Amino acid sequence: MNYIWRDYNPNTMGYIEAWLDESAIQSTGLDDGFRDFYEYWANEDGFAVGENFWCKVAYENDEPFAVIAFCRHEQKTNIMEVVIVPEKRSQGKGSKLLKEFLENAEITGCAIHKSEAVIYPDNIASQKAFENAGFKYSHNHEDQDRESMLYVYDGGVNDYE
């Protein structure tokens, strides 16, 4: 593996909040910050941290540079959020991170055969990162009050249509 992966700890990893610049907030659902997002899902009915909901922080050269939140539901891994530190964006890190995430069961505790992600139409960087990692655009998806796009991964083959 290229990266070191650690479990997110909301009490010691406050630096992730600083990664949420205006661009990141506009392209994610993290208007209230990553910690609030994490606390919401960690306490949501049907979700249990370490059982079907996780957040992992990726490190490169002992420096944290990305966080990924995901859950397991109906034999799929749903990627809920990916945030990369601003100075590492637009360098191919997102697709490399996603590929490593998908290909290494030790990160998630199980092999990922199917995965989904919902991406906003104006988030071109995320669309490219997910496509380069093997995801395919499936269809438009209504996500609360904002139009979104569903991307799917099935070992690199799109059979969701």
Task: Report residues per predicted region.
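Conserved beta-strand-loop-alpha-helix junction that forms the acyl-donor binding cleft
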Residues: 89, 115-127, 144-145
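Acetyl-CoA-dependent GNAT
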Residues: 7-14, 19-81, 85-87, 98, ...
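Glycine-rich phosphate-binding loop
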Residues: 92
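Active-site beta-strand termini and strand-to-loop segments that position acidic
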Residues: 59-61, 153-156
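Conserved catalytic-core motifs of GNAT/GCN5-like acyltransferases
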Residues: 116-118, 134-151
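Conserved N-terminal entry element of GNAT/NAT acetyltransferase domains
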Residues: 1-14, 18, 154-161
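Conserved active-site alpha-helix within GNAT-family acetyltransferase domains
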Residues: 95, 121-139
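Conserved GNAT acetyl-CoA-binding A-motif
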Residues: 105-119
